[in-house]
């Protein structure tokens, strides 16, 4: 037997090398490729032998693998020709070979706001101090960030009052290869750091875990930053800044550069994070969904979750278009963005008359006399002779006359697609304008506007009032007032337009996003001494204000870390369930959460709703989406039994894909939400769910009865069987069925609703969506 195996391997080596040599002599495009070979073998033998064989053969042909994956999964990345890639894809043990694509990053008060949201919902926890709750459990929880690196000297990452590094930590602190490698140091807070370079981007300056973009530093401080007093952005948003889990440890995996984040580096970071012993992985980036076996985040997160690591991802910044969600595999927690109740007021005084005050918002740190009045014009009146009037109204580049704009405040419209606010303000500034007033009812994100230039944003109805004033006087003047931050008076949360929307492009039978969290104008730590981030005439900031689902993701990562520290035995699915079923759907005024344009938000906008801090710590019941659910998902999605057995090494004996299944069956995995696709109304659809009692023994509610309530739209009939669930003890599991039917032949629109189980103390809510569309119905 051994002799036969040796002959087989020798023949394969000869054949492989001969074809590789032939590929060299033929004209073929080349590039970086990822070779994914499924799960890492439990005993380090067979599967890894395939990896070693292929990678060693490549080396013999002069091809050195950039990365080898061996801890959480098997595979490698290498520079190959197309022919070589096609050849390797046909070899035993290879699941997929795909180009090494570039992923893009999805780029204080937020935690105080979430605390208030929790208090409104969770009376049991209103007596508990936030800091005390944080310090009770979190010291041994490790959050791994796959991002642009970290600035270790930032105040958020000091290790005051931190205990010894947890014994479970198996990672390292790479100091880099720069001229002063000792300048990067870890501590008891920042316990580990790694960096990854690919053949695409080799730069000695980036051979370090240090952050040169600010993104990784910002998100890490949101999730796990220490408590910092008197934090502010040049006096704005001042107060105590803290991470969601300030006692958790941080491990940074710098997989991103100025150009983006290489998929091969992302997989290498996943592989190391799994081996290092992190509890939570936070990822604020994404790749457009196309194929689960060619998505580094779907692959890496599957193997991380398989080992009990919770993976939290941003939903993307491609909204408000439908089917624009990123990172929507069911083993991930997918996070949308929402607003908080803090606003940055920058009002406009018309004609020096205090009775003509227009409410605006913006962040202005300009070094000019903010009490002085300047001439006010609408951009239309500054149009170049040969410019398009609509483009000029919107302050598009090269459409305005500099001689007219110079020294004035310019009112710009915002009713053209693909018009970035910064382009408009940059154009007015370039032409010598004093400031810009933008008429826009959708823009909430102020982070991309140059704060050294006077900019304020107003609502369309206020724009009409300004135009009325301009037309009523021969010499209109205005003053843009100094910015001041105010909390508590803004309607919040709402869903900003940039946050990506469901349904999931690859299948409508899973509801994504899962949850929403603050992601607009978030204050957090920044690079120390970064002059590129400093407004004109100001010193570099210690903290910066950023927006995006990149900022939403670490809010949930911090909460996930809190839950893991409080309940070490909880699985990633239990943590996700607790976060989702305790979410809120109401604003701080008691109205339903809306989108940025004022429309009622749906689960396609915010999933289960807005995350709360304390609610997930006591959810009552949880939906345990187990490993078998994920294997069935792969089977329902279309993978074969042989493929699934390569993807996972935790396959039950006798496993086979369910016969005659399809993607519609994905609705039956034990997820905290329900999504029914291809609903024709002629016949009912039935799904089942199982819940586990995790009530607190301290309250004495182990023996408890939950009763269901249903919120369903007109035209959709929803029945739940049984309507009561009687749990005898903690850990009991009970199942129920949900039957959907319709009073009409076909649903005209997607139907949204919810199912809530309540025992008088806990409300366990699951959103649902029912649609007549199937996976072939694209809305893009």
Swiss-Prot record:
GO biological process: proteolysis
Single GO molecular function: serine-type endopeptidase activity
Assigned keywords, A-Z: Autocatalytic cleavage, Glycoprotein, Hydrolase, Protease, Secreted, Serine protease, Signal, Zymogen
List of catalytic residues: 147 (charge relay system), 215 (charge relay system), 550 (charge relay system)
Residues spanning the signal sequence: 1-25
Propeptide residues according to the Swiss-Prot or TrEMBL record: 26-106
Keyword Protease attached: yes
Residues carrying sugar: 197, 230, 471, 776
Domain Inhibitor I9: 33-106
Gene Ontology CC terms, in alphabetical order: extracellular region
E.C. no: 3.4.21.-
Organism listed in the record: Arabidopsis thaliana (Mouse-ear cress)
Family per record: Belongs to the peptidase S8 family.
Domain (PA): residue spans on this chain: 385-469
Gene: SBT5.1
Name of the featured protein: Subtilisin-like protease SBT5.1
Enzyme class: hydrolase
Domain Peptidase S8: 110-617
Compartments it resides in: Secreted
A Pfam match: fn3_6
InterPro entries: Peptidase_S8/S53_dom (IPR000209), Peptidase_S8/S53_dom_sf (IPR036852), Peptidase_S8_His-AS (IPR022398), Peptidase_S8_Ser-AS (IPR023828), Peptidase_S8_subtilisin-rel (IPR015500), Peptidases_S8_3 (IPR034197), S8pro/Inhibitor_I9 (IPR010259), S8pro/Inhibitor_I9_sf (IPR037045)
